[in-house]
Regions:
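Short, well-ordered alpha-helix to beta-strand connector turns
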Residues: 87-88, 132-133, 169
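Cofactor-binding loop segments of dinucleotide-utilizing enzymes, especially the Rossmann-like FAD-
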Residues: 9, 140, 177
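N-terminal beta1-alpha1-beta2 submodule of the flavodoxin-like/Rossmannoid cofactor-binding fold
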Residues: 1-94, 101-110, 114, 195-199
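Short histidine/acidic/glycine/proline-rich micro-motifs that form metal-
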Residues: 11-13, 143-144, 180-182
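Glycine-rich phosphate/pyrophosphate-binding loop and the adjoining helix
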Residues: 27, 147-199
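Short, glycine-/small-residue-rich phosphate/pyrophosphate-handling segment
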Residues: 121-166
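Hydrophobic/aromatic beta-strand patches that form the interior of the parallel beta-sheet core
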Residues: 5, 39-41, 136-138, 173-175
Length: 199
């Protein structure tokens, strides 16, 4: 049995192409692992706060100085990290907004990248602590960024590969549905993305 964590970051709800692509990945995973369970974390419906001073202080406070206030400030972070630790597979929906990821997804990432929780430093080098998990990214975009003249404009995939790899999530597969704003491509963009899914 596999535990799947589905992380939604699109603000478009039922009209979201990243969610549709994400669901195709999940459907394929459930067909492969019939007894799998899916936990859905919708970062738009259940917002993670952008980091403030209270969060940063709570993340780095020494154990002897911890307090109920600091523990409260860590609530979202602890929840997000626990969900990742319990999952075998992560399926993350990534609509590209302004060449990068949605702020809702960035806020979630800021809560999961934690010293002594998801990464540590050994001999001066960072080491990820979240290991042995598979990650699928369901990327949707109006432009075509996987190849061609605008490939360098995509800051979403390189960033996600780097930051997730930083905490140990290095087994990453990307599926794309792209070109929704490109004449001649937009009508087949979603279907082409769905047909590319293989897990």
């Amino acid at each position: 049995m596999k535990k799947i964590l589905s992380v939604i970051s699109s603000a478009r709800g039922k009209a979201s192409n990243s969610i549709r692509l994400q669901q195709e990945i999940i459907d394929k995973l459930q067909a492969r692992y019939p007894e799998s369970t899916v936990t859905v974390r919708d970062l738009v419906a259940q917002k993670y706060p952008h980091l403030e001073e209270s969060h940063l202080t709570a993340f780095y406070v020494q154990e002897e100085n911890d307090s109920p206030e600091y523990r409260l400030a860590r609530t979202h972070s602890e929840q997000a990290i626990r969900e990742i630790e319990e999952a075998d597979i992560l399926v993350i929906g990534v609509p590209i907004y302004n060449f990068s990821i949605p702020s809702a997804l960035k806020a979630w990432i800021d809560h999961i990248v934690r010293s002594r929780k998801t990464f540590t430093v050994v001999d001066g080098r960072p080491e990820g602590l979240v290991k042995n998990k598979k990650v699928y990214l369901a990327v949707a975009s109006g432009g075509v960024f996987s190849d061609g003249p605008y490939k360098s404009w995509d800051f979403a995939e390189p960033y996600l590969r780097h930051i997730l790899g930083f905490i140990g999530l290095t087994d990453i597969t990307v599926f794309r549905a792209e070109g929704f704003s490109v004449p001649g491509v937009q009508d087949v963009a979603l279907q082409k993305g769905i047909e590319s899914v293989a897990v």
